[in-house]
Swiss-Prot record:
Disulfide bonds: none
Subunit note: Interacts with SLC39A10; which triggers cells to undergo EMT and mitosis. Found in a complex with SLC39A6, SLC39A10 and with the 'Ser-727' phosphorylated form of STAT3 throughout mitosis. Found in a complex with SLC39A6, SLC39A10 and with NCAM1; this complex controls NCAM1 phosphorylation and integration into focal adhesion complexes during epithelial-to-mesenchymal transition (EMT). Found in a complex with SLC39A6, SLC39A10 and with GSK3B that controls NCAM1 phosphorylation.
Keywords attached to this entry: Cell membrane, Cell projection, Coiled coil, Glycoprotein, Ion transport, Membrane, Phosphoprotein, Signal, Transmembrane, Transmembrane helix, Transport, Zinc, Zinc transport
Record-given protein name: Zinc transporter ZIP6
Residues modified as Phosphoserine: 457, 464
Gene Ontology CC terms, in alphabetical order: apical plasma membrane; endoplasmic reticulum; lamellipodium membrane; membrane raft; plasma membrane
UniProt family annotation: Belongs to the ZIP transporter (TC 2.A.5) family.
Family annotation (Pfam families): Zip (PF02535)
Length: 741
């Protein structure tokens, strides 16, 4: 009994050992049979013809890029440059990539069309890169079983054996090559009930019968069209590379080193075959192509909202700027005080900072922009379809780096402008300080000559009185009546006659000046005489102060061109009628307001932040401008109501310019970039030519004010203007305002 039991146990153990060997032998026999059947015909491809064409194409490649049947690194680099995968490029696209096969509609220079990744099961890629089985020594351990009429299972060999069932998608064997050169196989088959699926070698293609069954099942699944599939079909490789990792753009050196090849090695045809999968993988994964159409921000409002914001924002901005003329009514009592002069100096400096900052930090970068924000309303859907990883890399890194690069360069230009302003201003202050110090040192020496100078002064005053009597018939009565009139609120803006004689007026010998200017008048000689006599002695006091009162107005006209309250002398305002002066204000300021409205309208069509930036710049430089216009009209004899009315009429052209800018920016978006460039030039001209000289040639000491106080106040205004424009430029993409009706 024990002997029988022992024999049974031995036989059982022998059967248990020999059964796996039998299975292995049957598996090997099955593989050999499959290879013999498909030796000359693999998945519909004639191997003999494929090998012949492979040799032909290799000969062509080596003939173009190699020498003596070998390919050097330089030749290989030229090959990569020719197919466009040697470096990252930006490709402009204008359509949505809803499925991967849509790349066939690209232009010829993009050359990355795909004919459906499911067709890769026919070993089309192996026809281009044969001998893939030379690197594959292992087998795919993943298997799939089917029972009854159960749908096929999708086995994924690259995700650690995890299986995902699908009832509508059936794919055949797909060869996938990553940059490291390791080959993976994605398989699917529909076995018969009760039959166990064997392991499939990645280098062994499916048989013809299996291929036909897979094709029938694929067509059947497509006809059924399962509703559970909610997104377009993608190949396994594309979904893997776009979601799980970032394909690096390999150049020639990286491709060689990643395949274990020396950079100095000479490649033959066999070694070049190993590089084919990596090259095809980079072309297929578009590793070296970046679509600039995906760089647009998803949070930009649609164009319909932008048009509504443009009209509303432009109307509000123009209205606020136009109402600045009413501010002159409030500031009339303050115009006689020193505080108003400090305020005006700060406003001029603020205008310089905002105008130049808007030109260099906003208008010029937007005029060089390669895309327009208004046609990005379809981009959020495109970003969602491409995945969050691609959207994050393209939208944030690329756009922010390119836009902020222009912003930092503009900020550097502003730094150079501010540096030169500081240098010129500080040198002027140092020179004035030295002159004042020398003047204080000479005072003790001149004390001895005080009595003699007093006597000389009396003699000169008597002589000037006699000359003025002679000159009475040759000059207008208005010049003589100027001193007898009641001083208006605006007369206090000018320095007194004593201040003019001591500081602003260049003194000359009375007889020479009288002989030169009395016969011919001073109408055409004021400016030249002022500069010709600027450096002469100040020992004598000038005699005809009325003439130099006119000269003082011309001095302010030359050095303060942007302040309209000092452009015209009192007699010019009286001689000109109210209607003529009103026409000058309406046309002159109206043209200026039209250009401002044009810039604001075009800027608001670009976006809310763009319109806000330009509106702030226009507001800051229009504030002293409108105050000057109001003062000129009041000085001409107008009432407050009339001055407000004429300023309102000139503001109407600003609304017309705003409407023109909105229409141009909305319907001709390429023209708006040119408007931005033109506006930047206008802003820079107004800031540097009109306002900076007024800052540098201030008459602070003439009014008993500190020059250093003016200096620090002007610096505060400039830096504040720079800071406002810089903040708007940096955070403009986050300034979003939507209007829903």
């Amino acid at each position: 009994m024990a002997t029988n039991l022992s024999v049974i146990m031995i036989l059982t153990f022998a059967l248990w050992v020999t059964n796996p060997l039998h299975e292995l032998q049957s598996t090997a026999a099955f593989s050999q049979t499959t290879e013999k059947i498909n030796s000359n015909w693999e998945s519909g491809i004639n191997v003999d013809v494929a090998v012949t064409m492979q040799r032909h194409h290799l000969q062509q490649l080596f003939y173009r890029y190699g020498e003596n049947d070998s390919l050097s690194v330089e030749g290989f680099r030229k090959l990569l440059q020719n197919i466009g995968i040697d470096k990252i490029k930006r490709v402009h696209i204008h359509h949505d990539h809803e499925r991967h096969s849509d790349h066939e509609r690209h232009s010829d220079h993009e050359r990355h069309s795909h004919r459906g990744h499911a067709a890769a099961g026919k070993n089309s890629r192996k026809a281009f890169c044969p001998d893939l089985d030379s690197d594959n020594s292992g087998k795919n351990p993943n298997t799939s079983q089917g029972k009854g009429s159960r749908p096929a299972e999708h086995v994924n060999g690259r995700r650690n054996g995890k299986e995902s069932a699908s009832s509508s998608e059936v794919t055949s064997a797909v060869y996938n090559t990553v940059s490291e050169g390791t080959h993976f196989l994605e398989t699917i088959e529909t076995p018969k009930p009760g039959r166990r699926t064997k392991d499939i070698n990645p280098s062994t293609p499916p048989s013809i019968t299996e291929k036909s069954r897979v094709g029938r099942l694929s067509r059947l699944a497509r006809r059924k069209g399962n509703d559970s599939v909610s997104e377009p079909r993608k190949s396994f490789m594309y979904s893997r590379t776009s979601n799980d990792n970032i394909q690096e753009c390999f150049n020639a050196t990286k491709l060689l080193t990643s395949h274990g090849m020396s950079v100095q090695a000479l490649l033959n045809a066999t070694e070049f075959n190993y590089l084919c999968p990596a090259i095809i993988n980079q072309i297929d994964a578009r590793s070296c192509l970046i679509h600039t159409a995906s760089e647009k921000k998803a949070e930009i409002p649609p164009k319909t909202y932008s048009l509504q914001i443009a009209w509303l924002g432009g109307f509000i901005a123009i209205s606020i700027i136009s109402f600045l003329s009413l501010l002159g009514v409030i500031l009339v009592p303050l115009m006689n005080r020193v505080f108003f002069k400090f305020l005006l100096s700060f406003l001029v400096a603020l205008a310089v900072g905002t105008l130049s900052g808007d030109a260099l930090l906003h208008l010029l970068p937007h005029s060089h922009a390669s895309h327009h924000h208004s046609h990005s309303h379809e981009e959020p859907a495109m970003e969602m379809k491409r995945g969050p990883l691609f959207s994050h890399l393209s939208a944030q890194n690329l756009e922010e780096s390119s836009y902020f690069d222009s912003t930092w360069k503009g900020l550097t230009a502003l730094g150079g402008l501010y540096f030169m302003f500081l240098v010129e201003h500080v040198l002027t202050l140092i020179k004035q300080f030295k002159d004042k110090k020398k003047k204080n040192q000479k005072k003790p020496e001149n004390d001895e000559d005080v009595e003699s100078k007093k006597q000389l002064s009396k003699y000169e005053s008597q002589l000037s009185t006699n000359e003025e009597k002679v000159d009475t018939g040759e000059r207008p009565e208005s010049y003589l009546q100027a001193d007898s009139q009641e001083p208006s609120p605006f007369d206090s803006q000018q320095p007194t006659l004593l201040e003019e004689e001591e500081v602003m007026i260049a003194h000359a010998h009375p007889q020479e000046v009288y002989n030169e200017y009395v016969p011919r008048g001073c109408k055409n000689k004021c400016h030249s005489h002022f500069h010709d006599t600027l450096g002469q002695s100040d020992d004598l006091i000038h005699h005809h102060h009325d003439y130099h009162h006119i000269l003082h107005h011309h001095h302010h006209q030359n050095h303060h061109p942007h302040s309209h309250s000092q452009r015209y002398s009192r007699e010019e305002l009286k001689d000109a009628g109210i209607a003529t002066l009103a026409w000058m204000v309406i046309m002159g300021d109206g043209l200026h307001n039209f250009s401002d409205g044009l810039a604001i309208g075009a800027a608001f069509t670009e976006g809310l932040s763009s319109g806000l930036s330009t509106s702030v710049a226009v507001f800051c430089h229009e504030l002293p401008h409108e105050l000057g216009d109001f003062a000129v009209l009041l000085k001409a004899g107008m009432t407050v109501k009339q001055a407000v009315l004429y300023n309102a009429l000139s503001a109407m052209l600003a609304y017309l310019g705003m409407a023109t800018g909105i229409f141009i920016g909305h319907y001709a978006e390429n023209v708006s970039m040119w408007i931005f460039a033109l506006t930047a030039g206008l802003f820079m001209y107004v800031a540097l030519v009109d306002m900076v000289p007024e800052m540098l040639h201030n008459d602070a000491s003439d009014h008993g004010c500190s020059r250093w106080g003016y200096f620090f106040l002007q610096n505060a205004g400039i830096l504040l203007g720079f800071g406002i424009m810089l903040l708007i430029s940096i955070f403009e993409h986050k300034i979003v305002f939507r209007i829903n009706f």
